[in-house]
């Protein structure tokens, strides 16, 4: 029997997601497998993340899956996309989105400008290995990671303030998923700073190199502030656009666009 699922496809600076309302998942699905099937760019719809959301009156719950079927704790670009979708559906401009135990306060400035307060980040978590361990591990592959820092944005990030070619970014991104360093993997950010702007490339765990990463922008901005490399406000630049970043009372606030691509019905057996 074929099931039909209504979906919306959106992107934030080229980081695309397929969004489904939980009420449309009436039949029992293996959500991890469904995410993999939908994310496939040849046999599915194609996306970087698969998003399920549910309205709880005062807030919206968001569940995130990567293309490999693994779950994710945060996606900044998908958050902006979902906030815009809710705005288009309801007219609400102040929207609270909850992912796991993290509350994200969203504000629709206009249809092309959505702000997300991701709260405070942490530089001291049990999952974070020492810089010496990271350097020693990278040295096995003849890669010099000059300036690194771990940051938790609700999901784990490693920020590397060193210029690396794309082929080396791929090697480093894959290598640093080793269980001996990061038990559950890590998002690896390659940040270059010039004129108080961060040019950023991100290797997302469960995805690979992506066109943009909102949580990576937040983590890299916070890391740059901590190291004294930048000041607030700042801009994070990706291939397909940029995010405005600022810090207020210890909270990181991201502002950027979200774009509707398509609406349709996904058929699955």
Swiss-Prot record:
<keyword id="KW-0028">Amino-acid biosynthesis</keyword>
<dbReference type="InterPro" id="IPR018510">
    <property type="entry name" value="DAP_epimerase_AS"/>
</dbReference>
<keyword id="KW-0457">Lysine biosynthesis</keyword>
<dbReference type="GO" id="GO:0005829">
    <property type="term" value="C:cytosol"/>
</dbReference>
<feature type="binding site">
    <location>
        <position position="15"/>
    </location>
    <ligand>
        <name>substrate</name>
    </ligand>
</feature>
<comment type="subunit">
    <text>Homodimer.</text>
</comment>
<feature type="binding site">
    <location>
        <position position="49"/>
    </location>
    <ligand>
        <name>substrate</name>
    </ligand>
</feature>
<feature type="binding site">
    <location>
        <begin position="214"/>
        <end position="215"/>
    </location>
    <ligand>
        <name>substrate</name>
    </ligand>
</feature>
<comment type="function">
    <text>Catalyzes the stereoinversion of LL-2,6-diaminopimelate (L,L-DAP) to meso-diaminopimelate (meso-DAP), a precursor of L-lysine and an essential component of the bacterial peptidoglycan.</text>
</comment>
<comment type="similarity">
    <text>Belongs to the diaminopimelate epimerase family.</text>
</comment>
<dbReference type="Pfam" id="PF01678">
    <property type="entry name" value="DAP_epimerase"/>
</dbReference>
<keyword id="KW-0963">Cytoplasm</keyword>
<feature type="binding site">
    <location>
        <begin position="204"/>
        <end position="205"/>
    </location>
    <ligand>
        <name>substrate</name>
    </ligand>
</feature>
<feature type="binding site">
    <location>
        <position position="66"/>
    </location>
    <ligand>
        <name>substrate</name>
    </ligand>
</feature>
<feature type="site" description="Could be important to modulate the pK values of the two catalytic cysteine residues">
    <location>
        <position position="157"/>
    </location>
</feature>
<comment type="pathway">
    <text>Amino-acid biosynthesis; L-lysine biosynthesis via DAP pathway; DL-2,6-diaminopimelate from LL-2,6-diaminopimelate: step 1/1.</text>
</comment>
<protein>
    <recommendedName>
        <fullName>Diaminopimelate epimerase</fullName>
        <ecNumber>5.1.1.7</ecNumber>
    </recommendedName>
</protein>
<feature type="active site" description="Proton donor">
    <location>
        <position position="75"/>
    </location>
</feature>
<feature type="binding site">
    <location>
        <position position="187"/>
    </location>
    <ligand>
        <name>substrate</name>
    </ligand>
</feature>
<dbReference type="GO" id="GO:0009089">
    <property type="term" value="P:lysine biosynthetic process via diaminopimelate"/>
</dbReference>
<dbReference type="GO" id="GO:0008837">
    <property type="term" value="F:diaminopimelate epimerase activity"/>
</dbReference>
<feature type="site" description="Could be important to modulate the pK values of the two catalytic cysteine residues">
    <location>
        <position position="204"/>
    </location>
</feature>
<feature type="binding site">
    <location>
        <begin position="76"/>
        <end position="77"/>
    </location>
    <ligand>
        <name>substrate</name>
    </ligand>
</feature>
<feature type="active site" description="Proton acceptor">
    <location>
        <position position="213"/>
    </location>
</feature>
<feature type="binding site">
    <location>
        <position position="155"/>
    </location>
    <ligand>
        <name>substrate</name>
    </ligand>
</feature>
<dbReference type="InterPro" id="IPR001653">
    <property type="entry name" value="DAP_epimerase_DapF"/>
</dbReference>
<keyword id="KW-0413">Isomerase</keyword>
């Amino acid at each position: 029997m074929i099931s039909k699922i209504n979906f919306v496809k959106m992107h934030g600076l080229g980081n695309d997601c397929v969004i489904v309302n939980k009420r449309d998942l009436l039949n029992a699905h293996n959500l991890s497998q469904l995410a993999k099937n939908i994310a496939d760019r040849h046999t599915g719809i194609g996306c970087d993340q698969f998003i399920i959301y549910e309205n709880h009156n005062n807030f919206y719950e968001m569940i995130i899956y990567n293309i490999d079927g693994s779950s994710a704790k945060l996606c900044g670009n998908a958050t902006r996309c979902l906030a815009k979708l809710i705005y288009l559906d309801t007219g609400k401009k102040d929207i609270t989105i909850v992912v796991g135990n993290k509350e994200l306060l969203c504000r629709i400035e206009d249809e092309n400008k959505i702000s997300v307060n991701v709260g405070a980040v942490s530089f001291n978590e049990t999952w974070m290995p020492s810089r010496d361990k990271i350097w020693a591990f990278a040295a096995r592959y003849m890669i010099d990671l000059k300036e690194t820092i771990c940051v938790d944005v609700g999901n784990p990030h490693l920020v590397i303030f060193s210029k690396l070619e794309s082929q080396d970014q791929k090697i480093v991104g894959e290598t640093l998923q080793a269980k001996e360093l990061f038990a559950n993997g890590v998002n690896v950010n390659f940040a270059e700073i010039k004129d108080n702007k961060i040019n950023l490339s991100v290797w997302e765990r469960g995805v690979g190199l992506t066109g943009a990463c909102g949580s990576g922008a937040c983590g890299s901005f916070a890391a740059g502030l901590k190291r004294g490399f930048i000041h607030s406000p700042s801009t994070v630049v990706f291939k397909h656009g940029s995010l405005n970043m600022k810090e207020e009372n210890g909270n990181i606030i991201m502002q950027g666009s979200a774009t509707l691509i398509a609406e349709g019905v996904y058929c699955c057996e």
